[in-house]
Amino acid sequence: MHYYVLTRLELSTVPSRPSVSPPPGKDSLIVPGSSQALTIPPNIEKHFQNLEFRFHAGYWKVFTAKSVLGDKDASIFVFDKAKSNIKAPPRIGRMNKFALADLIKYETNQLSSLNHPKILYSMHGLEESKDIMAFASEIVHFSLPMLIHDEGIERLEVKLGVLQLIDGLSYLHNSAKILHGNLTPDAVYVTVSRQWKIAGFSFSVAAKEPNCYPCFPWTKKLPPSLQPDLDFLAPEYLQPNQVTVTSAADVFSLGVLICWIYSGGKRLIDAKNNLETYQIIVGQLTEALNCISEQLGPNLRDSLCKVLSADIDQRPSVQLMALIKHFDDPALSAMRQLDDIAQVFDPSQKAHFLSHTLHAALPSIPENLWFTRILPRFNEQLSDSVELYTSLSKPLFFMLEHCESHNIHKLQDWMRRILDNIQQKTLRAFVLENLSVLFRRLTDEKVEDKCMELIVHSIKSDDTSTQSSAIRGLSHIADFLPLAFITRKLFPSILSLPPYLHDNVPRQLDLLAALAALSDRCDPNSLQQLLTGVSLCSSHHPVIIHAKSRIVQRIVTRDPVRLRDSQLVCVHLLNPLVIGLANRDLRLVFEKIQINKLRKNMIFLELLIIPHPFFFSHAIFQKRMGELQWPIFRKGF
């Protein structure tokens, strides 16, 4: 049976559509490299504006656009009938010819009837003028050949894209009951958010019976452009008297496409539209797979041997392909779950995924995917989900801490968003404990101001856990805080802590650790404020005495000239050290070491009381320093 007769039968199954032939539109599209301006159909012009050429994809010229209603991003696919409408040879006794335009009508009609996340979404059906055919879809950024050849792609993203194709084919076979029939690189588009979408339904057919689809053989009598791509066609299409195929035909095409992707755009079968060459190559596919085994890896290669088998029964179903060992990867699983997070309606499941699963997988995900896939998903799906900000903060702060410096600015909006919604107790605690990441990595005055405001409010809070989080975080950010903020806002807020500190040794230790870090930033005036804060830790517990001793040591070894006020030295430093020497609860193991340190500190503080500059040349000072082998001018203590 001749191919063109079967094609007519196929087209007869397409629902009838009214002929659309409006007058030419007013606007013209200029395609780079072409001197001809394309006039878009009026109905496309009516609904879409700001068209700009993006790329060529097969016989389509693809433009970006904005919808008039809603200002949504879109892509306009334009076909130039005047130049590209290839026609079949005339039929005997008939003047009409089967042409590429007929396939396009069928393709867009099929596309409009399908609705699935992995199928290209049609926003506006086909419109036709005298010379132009056009339709609108969701925005696409690349064709698959552009992505593979020009942009480059991580292996993890390749796996993710292939799984998306598997999902799309599974929908076609099991739900829509459609065989794609021509799954080639030109049939796959990549959206701005890096989702791979299936299109190119010119040769798709509906099932006659369960898993039984009409088969139209490839023939030399028709131009290749009016037939499926021979290099991606299953061998059963070419069997003599073959009238039906199964979904295994699409599985074979998918296998060839996977080889094309993993080999960097090299065709596994390159028959150049020659049937004899095709048959020879198909008989040697095992050897062909061996040539690209390094790119495929052992697990995928072994699976593809079955996928590309000439024996239909050896090929797995498309959904089973997703279960092969090659795709058993925690990072890949996390990326897939993130892509589908909009379909999860339980907030607790989303929170667990973001704070645990995704956070744990981030070290295994290449950094460029953090910003090309993960962050865009956050922006699209989660920017308004304030209740999930605590869970989102974990992966976001991990990305901020570990990303390259040129990517830091991409996280700025999220950090501002988090600090603007800091009311949640758990979120506030997490941010307080990770303030050092913000100060160290992000140069943003607005964020820094918000952080300092958060610190003061948290210290003054009535919630003890919030106060603890704020105080514990101070020791990590002391070097980043402006001295004016420390003296005017931070120290006064610390003086409000006696109820929080009362008879609580761990809390007093946390405060002393914070004050020790802040002491390096203090001048003589602010040092008095700091030592007043030290006095708030009034416990006589040995660890408190030891912590105070370390603060004294830190101050006098860093810059003793700051200690000019003798009353300050006696009240805030000598007094607690004397108490420490008299403390009988000090463990015997540490007693000698502790007392020796306290002795040294006290002697030095006594000498500081002698008016400056006399004490530096005073004989007693020099003698006592020698006796104690004071290490102030040596490294260490």
Q: What is each model feature region?
A:
Residues 56-104:
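ATP-binding glycine-rich loop module of kinase domains
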Residues 130-143:
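Conserved short submotifs of the Hanks-type protein kinase catalytic core
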Residues 161-162:
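Activation segment signature within eukaryotic-like protein kinase domains
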Residues 173-191:
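Catalytic-loop of the protein kinase fold
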Residues 185-231:
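Activation segment/activation loop of eukaryotic-type protein kinase catalytic domains
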Residues 236-248:
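Conserved end of the kinase activation segment
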